[in-house]
Amino acid sequence: MRIALGIQYDGAAFCGWQAQPHGNTVQDALERALAEFARVPLHTTVAGRTDTGVHGLGQVVHFDTELDRADFSWVRGTNAFLPPTVAVQWAKSMPDAFHARFSAFERTYYYALYVHPVRSPMLDGRAGWIHTPLDDDAMRAAAAHLLGEHDFSAFRSSECQSKTPVKHLYEIDIRRVGHFLHFRFRANAFLHHMVRNLMGCLVAVGRGRYPADWVADVLAGRDRNRAAPTFMADGLYLAHVGYPAEFAVPPAQLGSVPWSSVWADLDPQP
């Protein structure tokens, strides 16, 4: 039997998603809790591995088990053994054809950026921060150069294990609400550090360090050294993973973050 789970977690509390010998990752915490509840070891497969400090709103995993339990029992039972920084939001029995990673056709990330002369301790680990003003229109113009199918080698980390740097970036939406800038990135898939590297370049343009068409030159050059430094992880959230309708994967519980209303007019599953 294949079970899918929707997971939310505070990435600031963990050293990324993927299991490590020290055991302080989201996968480690989840698999320990599953083993406690199921009384047998269970291995999870994830839709997308997130880095240290990156949060999960709509993360999806699957695992195989011989245990026959009601879907919601997996939610309550697993949550009973999870730390406060991780929670299972839903569970659903799936056909064997479902795969958390390979069945997904798109991923959406949000980035929350606090733009203010003084940092806020209340936002530590929850939002990125920059103390200088940003030009929204310049960043939108730069973002337009990045849309479509491209070789994103200039925006991947040296540790990226993706088989190809070619990805299709469907959307970059930038919205300002008060002192916050909210970014929405949607693509078929992302490279390691790709969103944070895109953020670094957009912010550099927003600060006036480069013209908007500079990002087109960076993209065409396929050289990571020509791009801006990797931006901080604090404000980055894996918000949604898209699957074919046949699997009826429940939507992410975006209402659990205070700024979710920014995207209220957008379909969570485009």
UniProtKB/Swiss-Prot annotation:
Sequence positions that bind substrate = 109
User: What does the similarity note say?
Assistant: Belongs to the tRNA pseudouridine synthase TruA family.
Active-site residues annotated for this sequence: 51
EC number(s) given by UniProt: 5.4.99.12
Which residue spans traverse the membrane? none
Per the UniProt entry, what species is this protein from, by scientific name? Answer: Burkholderia multivorans (strain ATCC 17616 / 249)
Question: What is this protein for, i.e. what is its function?
Answer: Formation of pseudouridine at positions 38, 39 and 40 in the anticodon stem and loop of transfer RNAs.
Q: Which domain of life is it from?
A: Bacteria
Q: What is this protein called?
A: tRNA pseudouridine synthase A
Q: Which PANTHER family match?
A: PSEUDOURIDYLATE SYNTHASE, TRNA PSEUDOURIDINE SYNTHASE-LIKE 1
Q: Quick one: which gene encodes this? A: truA
Q: Which UniProt keywords apply?
A: Isomerase, tRNA processing
Please give the catalytic activity noted in the UniProt record.
Answer: uridine(38/39/40) in tRNA = pseudouridine(38/39/40) in tRNA
Q: Which SUPFAM superfamilies match?
A: Pseudouridine synthase
User: Molecular function terms in GO for this entry?
Assistant: RNA binding; tRNA pseudouridine(38-40) synthase activity
Pfam families associated with the record: PseudoU_synth_1
What does the subunit section of this Swiss-Prot or TrEMBL entry state? Homodimer.
Q: Which leading EC class covers this enzyme?
A: isomerase
GO BP of this protein:
tRNA pseudouridine synthesis
